[in-house]
């Protein structure tokens, strides 16, 4: 029987352990075998190889099937295979066809082992598609504030740096109520609060944007920011009474009633003072506070003159102080030709507001018939004349005196600042007054037309509180909501009748409108319940439509160095710290310790430039920032090479303790800075050897006034 030779050892290793252990490979044939014997053996092995191949195929199919006994007993999933996280030392040659066909599938990289870019870029540890070495986690811009770039050193980074790509810095990226970055989760720092100015906003946009598009985006951002802020303020304070008294339709009904009663009382007192000749025309609310109580005396002169007011048209020192402190009206109001227009316009406003508040018998209102009669009697008069009949005298008001009286009446009775274009329910502070003398203004005509159009719209409009109360809208909504509560009943004697559908009410009426009236008067709880949704919507709309609503004035971000990071020369303390910690950070990254260096950088970014006399730079601004102490190493800092007094930028240098170097840079009022001789400034800040003598000549220094302040070249003389 012919000898059977097994295949080579590499194919045996790829078999199952059972097959490999059942037989051992025979020794190789001796080298003295003849070629004829080898050919005979090959011919004899051909059928055996075919049989072995077919048997191996059956065995491989059996291997793919799970073991019946083991899997039936244990249904738990197989444990995860052990993964070798070590990098392969070298690439092995490709295995033969049989090995590739039956080799196990490639395993995925272990999770959370290494971050890889999936946006058609390269890993940060390799060449970045933009050139240089890019950080591994920088898909949406800088994700750490301050410090140095995370790979291969680099220039110092700043926490306020942002990418300026095409899709970065849009107003949608900032959340309402905050003006921070769009990707705040990666920054690790609090977002800066406040509305960005236009200059700050355009720094967030791409560089190739048009000015008109930038302006449009800023207006959208500003309106969205204010709307979001007002909405949050409203949701916080909407249940408070003071806000409801200003905007809620239900509360406004009682507010309007109290306001009308108070205005009637103040108008009565004002006219009495005018007839007695003791009216004060000052810009303050001196006659009555809007609370309805007389003002308390603030000095001995006022206490002595309680009940005796200043005569009409006469002023004192205190009135002059108030006039100087009051805000000034536009310059066109001082034109003498403007007096007649203002008198007629203020009289029309007095008639309009008095009718809204139901004030009657006001001598200042005048009328068209009286105006024509006065023009006939006083042909030489330049305007309307108001006759004031007192107890013992009769006086006529015209011109500037009449205008001041009308303006004061509008302010104290109706809370209307004529020159300030403001109408409020409570007059507080000082009203606008005319400036002395005419001041030339290039935009006087435009401002004058806007001024007149503003008050003409008020004359044609309605009471602002009545508009916010929206009685007509609420009545229409109530009528629609009360339709199911109006019942139509057939009566054999009287025909059709209409009954009340409220709970427990059995009254009948001849028409449906009487049922609606009955429900609104007798069943107010039902009407209020049905119109609650409409009232709440009006409440919110009234608040949002008021441009001067509380909580609607956004706080702008601090300008100046906070707008843009200042790349100033780093302090000596930071330079020492970077030397001590930079090598350790690079070594940690080389070992794969790339997870905690970001948090250290964030801490350092808030403390760059730790000089107490220096204005620190906070990347995000705002109050309540977290200040973390700078990194301190346990290794003693090496001595610094500092130039001797009088030396140039190339030396000579002497070693100095770091404390002395930092003290010299930290104290600007101390000895002279480096590269300048001490001259008359006193002794040098170093303990020098007698071999180094000071040059008596003072080194001239020059300052380039045109050089940009942000591009400061840092010269490190330690490398020389």
Swiss-Prot record:
Residues 1-192, 288-335, 361-380, 543-622, 666-687 are annotated as: Disordered. The keyword Nucleus applies. The gene is SE. This is Serrate RNA effector molecule. Belongs to the ARS2 family. GO terms for biological process: mRNA processing; primary miRNA processing; regulation of adaxial/abaxial pattern formation; regulation of alternative mRNA splicing, via spliceosome; regulation of DNA-templated transcription; regulation of meristem development; RNA splicing; shoot system development. GO terms for molecular function: DNA binding; DNA-binding transcription factor activity; zinc ion binding. It comes from Arabidopsis thaliana (Mouse-ear cress). The modification Phosphoserine is found at residues 76, 90, 92, 689. Acts as a mediator between the cap-binding complex (CBC) and both the pre-mRNA splicing and primary microRNAs (miRNAs) processing machinery. Required for proper processing of primary miRNAs to miRNAs, thereby playing a role in RNA-mediated gene silencing (RNAi) by miRNAs. Does not participate in sense post-transcriptional gene silencing. Acts as a regulator of meristem activity and adaxial leaf fate via the miRNA gene-silencing pathway by regulating the expression of PHB and by limiting the competence of shoot tissue to respond to KNOX expression. Disruption phenotype: Death during embryogenesis. Weaker mutants (se-1, se-2 and se-3) also exist. Mutant se-1 displays defects in shoot and leaf development. Mutants se-2 and se-3 show adaxial leaf curling, loss of asymmetric differentiation of abaxial and adaxial cell types and development of trumpet-shaped or radial leaves. Vascular polarity of se-3 leaves is also perturbed, with xylem elements forming both adaxially and abaxially in the vascular bundle. A zinc finger (C2H2-type) spans 498-523. Keywords: Metal-binding, mRNA processing, mRNA splicing, Nucleus, Phosphoprotein, RNA-mediated gene silencing, Zinc, Zinc-finger. Expressed in shoot meristems and in emerging organ primordia throughout development. Pfam families: ARS2 (PF04959), SERRATE_Ars2_N (PF12066). It comes from the Eukaryota.
């Amino acid at each position: 029987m012919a000898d059977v030779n097994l295949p080579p050892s590499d194919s045996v290793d790829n078999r199952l352990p059972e097959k490999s252990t059942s037989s051992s490979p025979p020794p190789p044939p001796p080298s003295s075998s003849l070629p004829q014997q080898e050919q005979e053996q090959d011919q004899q092995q051909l059928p055996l190889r075919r049989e072995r191949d077919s048997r191996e195929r059956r065995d491989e199919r059996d291997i793919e099937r799970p073991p019946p006994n083991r899997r039936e007993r244990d249904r738990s999933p197989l444990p995860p295979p052990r993964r070798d996280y070590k990098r392969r030392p070298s690439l092995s040659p490709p295995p033969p066809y049989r090995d590739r066909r039956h080799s196990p599938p490639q395993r995925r990289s272990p999770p959370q082992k290494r971050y890889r870019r999936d946006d058609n870029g390269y890993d940060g540890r390799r060449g970045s598609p933009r050139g240089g070495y890019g950080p591994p986690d920088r898909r949406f811009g800088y994700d750490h504030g301050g410090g140095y770039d995370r790979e291969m050193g680099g220039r110092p980074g700043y926490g306020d740096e942002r990418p300026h790509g095409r899709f970065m810095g849009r107003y949608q990226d900032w959340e309402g109520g905050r003006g921070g970055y769009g990707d705040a989760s990666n920054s690790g720092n609090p977002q800066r609060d406040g509305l960005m100015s236009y200059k700050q906003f355009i720094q967030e946009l791409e560089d190739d944007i048009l000015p008109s598009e930038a302006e449009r985006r800023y207006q959208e951002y500003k309106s969205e920011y204010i709307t979001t802020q007002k909405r949050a303020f409203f949701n916080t304070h909407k249940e408070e009474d003071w806000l409801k008294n200003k905007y809620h339709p239900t509360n406004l009904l009682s507010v309007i009633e109290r306001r009308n009663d108070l205005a009637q009382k103040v108008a009565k007192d004002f006219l009495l003072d005018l007839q007695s000749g003791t009216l004060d025309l000052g810009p303050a609310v001196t006659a009555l506070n809007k609370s309805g109580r007389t003002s308390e005396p603030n000095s001995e002169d006022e206490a002595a003159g309680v009940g005796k007011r200043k005569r009409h048209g006469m002023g004192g020192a205190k009135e002059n102080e108030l006039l100087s402190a009051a805000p000034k009206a536009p310059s066109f109001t001082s034109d003498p030709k403007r007096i007649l227009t203002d008198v007629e316009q203020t009289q029309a406003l007095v008639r309009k507001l008095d009718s809204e508040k139901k004030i009657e018998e006001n001598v200042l209102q005048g009328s068209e018939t009286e105006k024509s009669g006065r023009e006939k009697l006083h042909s030489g008069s330049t305007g309307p004349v108001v006759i004031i009949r007192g107890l013992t005298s009769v006086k006529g008001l015209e011109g500037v005196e009449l205008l001041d009286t009308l303006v004061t009446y509008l302010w104290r009775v109706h809370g209307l600042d004529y020159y300030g274009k403001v109408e409020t329910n409570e007059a507080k502070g000082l009203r606008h007054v005319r400036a002395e003398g005419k001041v030339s203004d290039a935009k006087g005509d435009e401002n004058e037309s806007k001024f007149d159009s503003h008050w003409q719209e008020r004359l044609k409009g309605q009471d602002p509180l009545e508009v916010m109360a929206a009685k007509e809208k609420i009545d229409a909504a109530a009528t629609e909501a009360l339709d199911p509560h109006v019942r139509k009943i057939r009566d054999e004697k009287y025909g059709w009748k209409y009954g009340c559908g409220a709970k427990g009410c059995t009254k009948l009426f001849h028409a449906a409108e009487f049922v609606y009236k009955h429900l609104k008067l007798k069943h107010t709880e039902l009407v209020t319940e049905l119109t609650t949704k409409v009232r709440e919507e009006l409440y919110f709309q009234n608040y949002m439509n008021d441009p001067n609503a509380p909580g609607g004035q956004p706080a702008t971000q601090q300008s100046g160095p906070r707008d843009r990071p200042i790349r100033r020369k780093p302090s000596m303390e930071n330079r020492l710290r970077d030397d001590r910690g930079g090598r350790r950070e690079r070594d940690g990254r080389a070992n794969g310790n790339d997870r905690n260096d970001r948090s250290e950088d964030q801490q350092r970014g808030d403390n760059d430039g730790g000089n107490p006399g220096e204005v620190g730079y906070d990347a995000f601004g705002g109050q309540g920032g977290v200040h973390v102490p700078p990194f301190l190493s346990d290794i003693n800092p090496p001595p610094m090479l500092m130039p001797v007094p009088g030396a140039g930028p190339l030396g000579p240098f002497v070693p100095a303790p770091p404390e002395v170097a930092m003290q010299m840079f930290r104290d600007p009022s101390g000895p002279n800075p480096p590269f300048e001789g001490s001259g008359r400034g006193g002794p040098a800040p170093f303990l020098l050897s007698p071999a180094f003598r000071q040059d008596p000549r003072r080194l001239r220094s020059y300052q380039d006034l045109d050089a940009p302040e942000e591009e400061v070249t840092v010269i490190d003389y330690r490398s020389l």
